[in-house]
Curated annotation (Swiss-Prot):
Its EC number is 1.17.4.4. It comes from Rattus norvegicus (Rat). Keywords: Disulfide bond, Endoplasmic reticulum, Membrane, Oxidoreductase, Quinone, Redox-active center, Transmembrane, Transmembrane helix. Its main location: endoplasmic reticulum. This is Vitamin K epoxide reductase complex subunit 1. The chain crosses the membrane at residues 10-29, 81-95, 101-128, 132-153. Residues 30-80, 129-131 are lumenal. The gene is Vkorc1. GO terms for biological process: blood coagulation; bone development; peptidyl-glutamic acid carboxylation; positive regulation of coagulation; regulation of blood coagulation; vitamin K metabolic process; xenobiotic metabolic process. Gene3D superfamilies: VKOR domain.
């Protein structure tokens, strides 16, 4: 009936920690690039493979949408990496809960993250014409978390008449 704690599972833990680490790395790269325009990140392999260019683009904040809808000063106009950190933390915490609502929230948040990943992948390839190793890896992590979320849907017992 109620919600109880459980282990999130090794795979969910690994995916969430990897996603969190990549999101924190993206924040670091963006901050370093803001301080020094000549900063070259480890993920900057060439002119068409540059994560720092992607993170510093207008689509690197609020998915490129928040500023135009809510304004540049909106609290939601944050680096996409901030949303990533929040998402991976929520996924890990919800993965520790056993209950119907936790499962529903896991699935819904996973679907939103995959939709966001598809949108950002489209921007990455067809607008920025770039290849971001960190971005592609987070998209794969999001897809993996979505698959895990669908596997973890609890079977509810049906009362026999």
């Amino acid at each position: 009936m109620g919600t109880t704690w459980r282990s999130p599972g090794r795979l969910r833990l690994a995916l969430c920690l990897a996603g969190l680490a990549l999101s924190l790395y993206a924040l670091h790269v963006k901050a370093a690039r803001a301080r020094n325009e000549d900063y070259r990140a480890l993920c900057d392999v060439g002119t068409a493979i540059s994560c720092s260019r992607v993170f510093s683009s207008r689509w690197g904040r609020g998915f490129g949408l928040v500023e135009h809808v809510l304004g540049a000063d909106s609290i939601l106009n944050q680096s996409n990496s901030i949303f990533g950190c929040m998402f991976y933390t929520i996924q890990l915490l919800l993965g520790c809960l056993r209950g119907r609502w936790a499962s529903i929230l896991l699935i819904l948040s996973s679907l939103v993250s995959v939709a966001g990943s598809l949108y950002l992948a489209w921007i990455l390839f067809f607008v920025l014409y770039d290849f971001c190793i960190v971005c592609i890896t987070t998209y794969a992590i999001n897809a993996g978390l979505m698959l895990l979320s669908f596997q973890k849907v609890p079977e509810h017992k049906v009362k026999k008449p």
